[in-house]
Design a protein with these regions (language model features):
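N-terminal pre-triad scaffold of radical SAM enzymes
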Residues: 7-43
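Residue-level preference for alpha-helix termini and adjacent loops
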Residues: 13-17, 23, 30, 47-49, ...
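Anionic group-transfer/hydrolysis microenvironments
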Residues: 15, 35, 47, 76, ...
Length: 160
């Protein structure tokens, strides 16, 4: 008889702060920063999340989120979609009545993301060094509550 292990995710940090981006700017938010990213954007401000981290169960993550006493949770990285168990985490957070957003690079499929999650897609410009990783067809899956983020690093990015 085999035993199925509960899903776990590699976690860099969980903290409470004010959201500084997207339409929730200024809103108290719990950030769940997952470890790992397949991209290496030149301007990345979270390279510390590429490696390391600790394995956490979804139950433990939700318990910690609950302790921080806010209603908005942002799952970020790294690239959260690089961890297959992120989908179970997103659904569990939504089931627990949190408003959930997902910050993603736009380089991975959005098909399995829970429809209750607000997707914030960071479309990569040439200045990122990762423009070829954009999955433009994924933008068709966005709805009216989802958002696109574009980091402009130069005039060339702006003109792009």
């Amino acid at each position: 008889m085999s035993v199925v292990a509960a899903p776990r995710l590699k976690l860099t940090e969980i903290f409470r702060s004010l959201q500084g981006e997207a339409d929730t700017v200024g809103i108290p938010t719990v950030f769940v920063r997952l470890t790992g990213c397949p991209l290496r954007c030149g301007y990345c401000d979270t390279a510390y999340a590429f490696h390391g981290g600790e394995w956490w169960s979804i139950e433990r993550i939700i318990d910690r989120v609950r302790e921080l006493e806010v209603t908005h949770v942002c799952v970020t990285g790294g690239e959260p979609l690089a961890q297959p168990s992120v989908h179970a985490l997103l659904a569990a957070l939504c089931d627990a009545s949190y408003r959930v957003s997902l910050e993603t690079s736009g380089s991975m499929s959005l098909a399995a993301v829970d429809s209750r999650v607000v997707k914030v897609v960071d479309v990569k410009t040439p200045g990122s060094g990762e423009v070829e990783r954009n999955l433009y067809a994924e933008l068709d899956a966005l709805n009216a509550t989802d958002q696109i983020k574009i980091v402009i690093t130069s005039l060339a990015d702006y003109e792009w």
